[in-house]
């Protein structure tokens, strides 16, 4: 199993927050499930210091901005009188300015992401009737979390999906392994969105200490469901195969029942 992926998915769920609210060229169809481009307003402010962009971030995207400042960057509280200058100064680092430009270029168009995201969540809703869709937006972080989940909202840090060979990812001081970098591509945006969202809804139990096998099985359940939502087998591990065998033997078990079942002995 991709233990690094499992570890990342588990760790990243500690950061919560977020929402969606911006009219852009990628949001041209009413009722279409798309990624909201909060990152564009963020980029405008961080590269030009445009005060109107900052105001739009705060008034149009208050929860995203709070999550970015307090939970992702951890540079202070959003109500701090000095937070505007702290926020702008933080991104004046030449590396982060280059990161912003790379995100703007790589993700100028995300129609492919929107298309796969909508199709995948539609499949997920078919498997899990009544599942509420998250509000999804994109942001630019600082190479920390990939996906931010909380309160029915889901934020994508585009700076973590610039490609396996993106120069910053290759630097030793960032410490990314080859396996980690293999998943830092735009092809993993939608799988990560679904996986993190499901882990937020169906977290590992905290009322007892889990063995490593139990933890791997929990991630295996989520990854198996992600495969079904994607319509392809992206994750093919001993644990996803274990879950697949279990579901074939128990055709009356729903996906929701599978995810809620934390008695891992039933699945092994």
Q: Which ranges hold each PLM region?
A:
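Exposed boundary/loop context
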Residues: 10-11, 134
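Sec-dependent signal peptide recognition
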Residues: 2-9
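N-terminal mature-domain "stem" immediately C-terminal to a signal peptide or N-terminal signal-anchor/transmembrane
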Residues: 19-89
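C-terminal motif of bacterial Sec signal peptides marking the signal peptidase cleavage site
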Residues: 14-17
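Acidic/His-rich structured neighborhood in mature extracellular/periplasmic domains
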Residues: 87-268
């Amino acid at each position: 199993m991709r233990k690094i992926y499992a570890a990342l998915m588990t760790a990243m769920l500690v950061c919560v927050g977020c929402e969606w609210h911006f009219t852009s060229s990628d949001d041209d169809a009413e009722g279409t499930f798309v990624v909201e481009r909060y990152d564009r307003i963020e980029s405008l402010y961080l590269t030009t210091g445009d005060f109107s962009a900052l105001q739009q971030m705060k008034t149009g995207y208050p929860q995203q901005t709070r999550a970015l400042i307090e939970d992702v960057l951890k540079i202070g509280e959003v109500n701090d009188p000095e937070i505007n200058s702290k926020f702008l100064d933080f991104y004046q680092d030449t590396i982060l300015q280059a990161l912003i430009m790379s995100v703007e270029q790589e993700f100028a168009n995300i129609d492919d992401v929107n298309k796969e995201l909508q199709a995948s969540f539609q499949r997920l809703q078919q498997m899990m009737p009544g599942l509420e869709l998250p509000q999804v937006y994109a942001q630019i972080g600082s190479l920390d979390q990939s996906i931010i989940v909380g309160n029915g909202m889901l934020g994508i840090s585009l700076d973590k999906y610039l490609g396996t060979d993106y120069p910053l990812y290759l630097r030793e001081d960032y410490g990314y392994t080859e396996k980690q970098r293999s998943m830092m591509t735009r092809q993993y945006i939608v799988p990560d969105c679904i996986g993190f969202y499901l882990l937020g809804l169906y977290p590992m139990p905290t009322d007892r200490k889990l063995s490593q096998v139990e933890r791997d099985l929990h991630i295996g359940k989520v990854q198996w469901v992600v495969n079904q939502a994607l319509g392809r087998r992206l994750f093919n591990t001993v644990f996803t195969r274990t879950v697949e065998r279990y579901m074939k033997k128990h055709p009356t078990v729903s996906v929701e029942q599978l995810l809620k079942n934390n008695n891992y002995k039933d699945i092994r």
